[in-house]
């Protein structure tokens, strides 16, 4: 398990042994064997090299051995298969020297002997293997418990570490061996007899490699490879089991890292990364522990047996060797003995080489060493005994090997129990070291304890001459290695020659391929250049695209701003448009109203112009009418005066009065002077005719006299003093009659024009004259024979006369009486035209309703004035007007009423005409202003 991995929870720190501590025990065991039994250690290394022989038919270079590769995770029983080898394949090629000829003969004999041995032992080895397989089953359950704790891990480095569980390790104590001091020996010759000549050649090659390594220890610093060596121990207190225990021992190898021997994949339960420094070799070696089962009762050192290579003859079906093929202990023990016997036979076949080896080994021998023959016989005896025990019992293998030093020094054999205790202690300490690898303080403590234990073992580790003995024993193998090297050189030369001959026809193809390769390389370079150009262009285009994207972003922001401004402006424009539309609609409505008003105003102006022209025409016609009325009134008065013969001549007008009146008129001229003067002249010219007629009717003068006698007392007290004699009354009557005639004609024309429905009837604004004359008109009481309107006027005059002065009533009554007295005179004297004209005037006056109200207002306004102006007629002149009109209507008019005509009456008449003109001008002005306003 790697140092970084989690530590199992079941692991507890103990100072004395564990229930499952096999890997630590094997590690300490191999470490102890290195220093306590150097000769046995070297022998184990030799056997391990023999086990890891090369495959048949493989060309082996000097000093290098390719390792066999096994598939990971595959477990199975590999039945031993013996290949039939050609004898010539193991023999060196003939050379010119005689030594090579002798070597070839010796090799042929050795190969034939080994073939016979292998053929004879095929059946026996297979039987032993079957027994072994049956006996190995009871311990598989124990193996499973130890192997389930950790996953497989493959260490790819050259220096590898492997933990071998020792559950199947058999510890056999020295007390349970034979009970004597003579140790059983393994026979290398018997062991070598079990192997083929190819394995023998591999053994010789590896020995040569180890010797060359030992000769160059001072120049090398580290190992190039690792060999796993198995130790087989004896245990007296336990039952024999068919599995042999496997330990690990470090050994140096010259195999390169490219071709490691036996790359092992293990189910590691405990793994250590500590490197053990071996002072004897001055070389750092890493320990690789294999996962193998052990027997946990007691620990004793034993003899090591090498782990075979993957192509070894037989492989045990055991769990501790999942990735390496091994030989079962029952098969391995006799085969190692046969191998030793084969080694002795081979050395006997080479006397010359043996002498050379003897002469070489004498330089390294010491007097205390044993001979190689004695070692071989001892090992052969031990191998035979182990083979018999394996075949008879089939359960355990008692392998107790001692070297020459242990045979001479019995005291070292007695100290085995003490060393076992130290080994157990070292095992526990190393287990603690592995468990606490990541903790610095604990690691330091455990390392110090391990060093203390190793210092206790240093007393038994001092045998430098063991390697010299091994070198003497392996001298024939070195000579064999030299022969194999020569054969290898020859084979390599042949191979090179074959390669040269085969290169001929392939040169053209090679040349074509090279040219094609060059062209393809050129094309590749060009394509790379074009690709670089395209990449540069692509980068430029990407930059341009990025710039365009940035510009597009800017433009999009600008467009958004513009759109927002346009939208805002559009909204404002819509608002303005709606407001303008509303204003335009209002303006159109106002325009329509104004047009309608203008049309109405134009129509009204047209109507007003028409009415104005009508008024002008009416005014002109009224003026003509006034003139005609004046003339007709003068004619009427003259006619009436001719009928009245009862008037007094004393009251008639004289020339002197007219002269006085002319003088007054000259002082105050008036526009109506000419008409009045003509009127007076007519009266004066007709006076003589009137006077002649009045003389014939004296009886009719009585009512006039009565009226004249009544009129002076009925005048108001504020009347003018100049009119006390009655002359002012006649002047007022004449002036009022003229004004009445003008106003009546104007009103009559308006009423006549009012018959049209479409035309507008306008009431004249000149109400001053109507105010003056309306009381006069309403006070009139004409005859019922004249018209119905006259009767209405008479009835209305009673109501309107109530607001005026009551002293008028006697005059009215007298006038009525006079009218009643003289109906016949009027009918005889009136002209028909004058009668019709008077009727029209009376009807027109009767159709003006507001005349009475304005007369009341004017009467109240002018009443209090005690000093009336000369242009305004006083109230006292109104009563003679009514009497004058009544006398106009009646036939009893007297000419004496005109005898009182003075300048004051003329002034009133002139003022009335001026007021009429002013009223007409005001009417025209008001019409013009009204048109302008509209």
Swiss-Prot record:
Q: Where in the cell is it found?
A: Cytoplasm, Cytoskeleton, Microtubule organizing center, Centrosome, Centriolar satellite
Residue positions where Phosphoserine is found in the record: 123, 656, 737, 781
Give yes or no: UniProt keyword Kinase.
no
| Keyword list, A-Z | Coiled coil, Cytoplasm, Cytoskeleton, Phosphoprotein
Coiled-coil region(s)? 432-606
Is Cytoplasm set as a keyword in this record? Answer: yes
InterPro entries reported in the protein's UniProt record: CCDC14
Q: Which residue stretches belong to region Disordered?
A: 1-22, 55-75, 128-156, 708-740, 793-829, 852-877
One GO location term (cellular component): ciliary basal body
Annotated TM spans = none
Q: What is its main location?
A: cytoplasm
Q: Please describe the quaternary structure of this protein.
A: Interacts with CEP63.
State what this protein does: Negatively regulates centriole duplication. Negatively regulates CEP63 and CDK2 centrosomal localization.
Q: What is this protein called?
A: Coiled-coil domain-containing protein 14
- Please give the organism: Mus musculus
């Amino acid at each position: 398990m790697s140092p970084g991995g989690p530590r199992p929870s079941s692991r507890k720190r103990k100072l004395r042994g564990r229930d499952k501590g096999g890997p630590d025990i094997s590690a300490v065991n191999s470490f102890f064997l290195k220093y306590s039994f150097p000769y046995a250690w070297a022998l184990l290394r030799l056997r391990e090299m023999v086990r890891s022989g090369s495959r048949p038919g493989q060309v082996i270079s000097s000093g290098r051995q390719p390792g066999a590769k096994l598939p990971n995770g595959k477990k199975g029983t590999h039945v031993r298969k013996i290949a039939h080898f050609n004898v010539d394949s193991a023999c060196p090629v003939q050379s010119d020297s005689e030594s090579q000829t002798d070597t070839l003969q010796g090799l042929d004999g050795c190969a034939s002997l080994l073939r016979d041995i292998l053929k004879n032992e095929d059946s026996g080895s297979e039987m032993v293997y079957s027994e072994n397989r049956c006996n190995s089953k009871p311990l598989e359950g124990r193996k499973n418990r130890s192997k389930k704790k950790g996953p497989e891990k493959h260490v790819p480095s050259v220096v590898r570490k492997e933990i071998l569980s020792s559950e199947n390790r058999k510890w056999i104590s020295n007390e349970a061996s034979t009970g004597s001091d003579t140790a059983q020996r393994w026979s290398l010759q018997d062991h070598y007899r079990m192997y083929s000549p190819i394995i023998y050649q591999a053994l010789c090659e590896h020995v040569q490699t180890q010797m060359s390594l030992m000769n160059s220890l001072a120049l090398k610093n580290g190992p190039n490879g690792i060999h796993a060596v198995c130790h087989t121990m004896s245990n007296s207190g336990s039952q024999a089991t068919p599995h042999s225990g496997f330990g690990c021992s470090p050994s140096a190898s010259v195999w390169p890292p490219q071709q490691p021997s036996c790359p092992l994949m293990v189910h590691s339960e405990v793994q250590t990364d500590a490197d053990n420094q071996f002072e004897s070799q001055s070389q750092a070696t890493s320990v690789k522990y294999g996962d193998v089962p052990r027997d946990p009762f007691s620990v004793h050192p034993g003899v090591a047996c090498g782990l075979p290579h993957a192509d070894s003859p037989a492989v045990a079906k055991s769990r501790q060797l999942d990735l390496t093929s091994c030989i079962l202990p029952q098969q391995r023990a006799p085969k190692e003995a046969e191998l030793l016997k084969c080694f002795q036979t081979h050395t006997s076949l080479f006397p010359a080489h043996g002498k050379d080896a003897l002469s070489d080994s004498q330089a390294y021998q010491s007097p205390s060493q044993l001979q190689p023959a004695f070692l071989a016989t001892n090992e052969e005896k031990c191998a035979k005994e182990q083979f018999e025990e394996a075949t008879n019992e089939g359960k355990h293998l008692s392998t107790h090997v001692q070297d020459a030093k242990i045979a001479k020094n019995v005291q070292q054999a007695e100290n085995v129990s003490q060393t076992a205790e130290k080994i157990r202690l070292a095992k526990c300490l190393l287990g603690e070291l592995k468990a606490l690898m990541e903790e610095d303080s604990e690691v330091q403590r455990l390392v110090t304890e391990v060093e203390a234990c190793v210092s206790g073992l240093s007393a038994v580790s001092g045998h430098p001459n063991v390697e010299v003995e091994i070198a003497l024993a392996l001298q024939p193998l070195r000579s064999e290695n030299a022969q194999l090297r020569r054969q290898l050189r020859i084979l390599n030369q042949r191979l090179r020659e074959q390669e040269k001959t085969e290169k001929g026809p392939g040169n053209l193809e090679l040349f074509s391929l090279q040219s094609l390769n060059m062209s393809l390389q050129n094309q590749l370079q060009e394509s790379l250049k074009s690709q670089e150009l395209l990449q540069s262009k692509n980068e430029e285009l990407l930059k341009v695209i990025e710039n365009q994207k940035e510009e597009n972003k800017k433009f999009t922001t600008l467009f958004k701003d513009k759109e927002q401004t346009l939208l805002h402006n559009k909204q404002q424009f819509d608002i303005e448009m709606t407001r303008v539309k509303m204003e335009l609609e209002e303006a159109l409505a106002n325009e329509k109203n104004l047009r309608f008003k203008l049309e109405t105003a134009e129509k009204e102006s047209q109507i007003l112009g028409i009415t104005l022209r009508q008024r002008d025409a009416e005014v002109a016609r009224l003026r003509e009418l006034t003139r005609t009325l004046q003339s007709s009134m003068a004619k009427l008065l003259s006619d009436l005066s001719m009928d009245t013969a009862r008037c007094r001549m004393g009251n008639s007008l004289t020339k002197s009065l007219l002269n006085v009146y002319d003088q007054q008129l000259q002082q105050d001229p008036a526009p109506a002077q000419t008409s009045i003067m003509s009127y007076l002249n007519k009266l004066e010219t007709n006076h003589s005719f009137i006077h002649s007629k009045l003389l014939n009717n004296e009886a009719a003068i009585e009512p006039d006299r009565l009226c004249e006698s009544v009129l002076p007392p009925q005048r108001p007290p504020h009347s003018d003093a100049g009119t006390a004699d009655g002359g002012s009354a006649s002047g007022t009557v004449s002036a009022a009659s003229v004004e009445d005639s003008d106003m009546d004609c104007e009103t009559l024309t308006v009423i006549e024009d009012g018959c049209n429905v479409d035309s507008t009837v306008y009431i004249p604004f000149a109400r001053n004259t109507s105010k003056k004359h309306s009381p006069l008109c309403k006070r009139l009481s004409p005859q019922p024979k004249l018209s119905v309107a006259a009767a209405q006027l008479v009835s209305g005059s009673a109501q309107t006369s109530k607001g005026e002065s009551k002293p008028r009533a006697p005059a009215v009554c007298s006038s009525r009486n006079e009218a009643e007295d003289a109906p016949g005179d009027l009918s005889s004297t009136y002209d028909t035209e004058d009668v019709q004209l008077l009727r029209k005037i009376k009807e027109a006056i009767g159709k003006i309703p507001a005349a009475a109200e304005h007369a009341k207002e004017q009467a109240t306004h002018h009443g209090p004035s005690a000093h009336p102006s000369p242009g305004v007629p006083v109230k006292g002149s109104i009563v003679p007007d009514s009497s004058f009109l009544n006398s106009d209507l009646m036939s009893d008019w007297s000419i004496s009423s005109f005898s009182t005509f003075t300048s004051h009456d003329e002034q009133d008449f002139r003022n009335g005409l001026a007021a009429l003109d002013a009223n007409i001008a005001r009417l025209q002005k008001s019409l013009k202003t009204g048109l302008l306003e509209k």
